[in-house]
């Protein structure tokens, strides 16, 4: 199987969500998903809103990133999760 890199966009529920605490929760979830975290950063959008992006490395698997997206979406402070890019490592 091939190794893939995936960039995932995570939107918090509001601008008041503590970014650093949310990043820690994201790391905890990803560590349980058998993936390597290659990047975790935030990007300001507008009016105090921001998106958090993570870049992960994983072995190609059935279902792709969907199980990871679902696990991240279960975090209380997360509004939405979307895989924005996937490529071979």
From Swiss-Prot:
<dbReference type="InterPro" id="IPR014038">
    <property type="entry name" value="EF1B_bsu/dsu_GNE"/>
</dbReference>
<comment type="similarity">
    <text>Belongs to the EF-1-beta/EF-1-delta family.</text>
</comment>
<dbReference type="InterPro" id="IPR004542">
    <property type="entry name" value="Transl_elong_EF1B_B_arc"/>
</dbReference>
<comment type="function">
    <text>Promotes the exchange of GDP for GTP in EF-1-alpha/GDP, thus allowing the regeneration of EF-1-alpha/GTP that could then be used to form the ternary complex EF-1-alpha/GTP/AAtRNA.</text>
</comment>
<dbReference type="InterPro" id="IPR014717">
    <property type="entry name" value="Transl_elong_EF1B/ribsomal_bS6"/>
</dbReference>
<dbReference type="GO" id="GO:0003746">
    <property type="term" value="F:translation elongation factor activity"/>
</dbReference>
<dbReference type="Pfam" id="PF00736">
    <property type="entry name" value="EF1_GNE"/>
</dbReference>
<keyword id="KW-0251">Elongation factor</keyword>
<keyword id="KW-0648">Protein biosynthesis</keyword>
<protein>
    <recommendedName>
        <fullName>Elongation factor 1-beta</fullName>
    </recommendedName>
</protein>
<dbReference type="InterPro" id="IPR036219">
    <property type="entry name" value="eEF-1beta-like_sf"/>
</dbReference>
């Amino acid at each position: 199987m091939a190794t893939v890199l995936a960039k995932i966009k995570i939107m918090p529920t509001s601008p008041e969500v503590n970014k650093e605490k949310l990043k820690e929760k994201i790391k905890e979830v990803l560590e349980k998903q058998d993936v390597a975290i290659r990047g975790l950063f935030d990007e300001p959008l507008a009016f105090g809103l921001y998106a958090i992006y993570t870049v992960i490395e994983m072995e190609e698997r059935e279902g792709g990133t969907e199980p990871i997206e679902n696990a991240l979406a279960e975090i209380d402070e997360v509004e939405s999760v979307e895989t924005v890019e996937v490529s071979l490592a």
